[in-house]
Amino acid sequence: MFGVARDQHAWVALDGTRYDAIGTDRKLYVVEEGLAYDITPIRETQALTNPFTTNATTSVVVTDTSHGAQKGDFVTFDSFSAIDGLDMNKEFEITSVANSDAYVVTTTSAASGSTSGGGGSGNAKYQISIGPELSTSAIVTGKQQML
């Protein structure tokens, strides 16, 4: 599991299956009989064409106009062609945001070459943005509020 747990809710289904929902600052999980499943909601899906730029390193620049992502968010790519030996059809954490139209993800191995605008056509599924790792509460005008 990614992140710092923020809340938890346990229940038992009518068939006796035990569930536990755990929300972290980064993801939302459901634990069923000891197995954790990532059920973090998707905030947006974008159809992209040739969005990847490689430079023979593990950093891949992704171009997506008005992506709305921030550092630490998660994106899942699907239906793209391999680019410079990299399979981009999986989930990545966004490691930096260049601007409102581009961000960087880091792969586990280096690209075998340098390509500007590759990968063919596919989808980018953006999960809801992450929250702060640290938070505190305070009494403000008689009401408890998260800061």
Predicted regions and their residues:
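Small/polar beta-strand repeat architecture
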Residues: 39-146
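Hydrophobic beta-strand segments of well-ordered beta-sheets in folded domains
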Residues: 19, 146-147
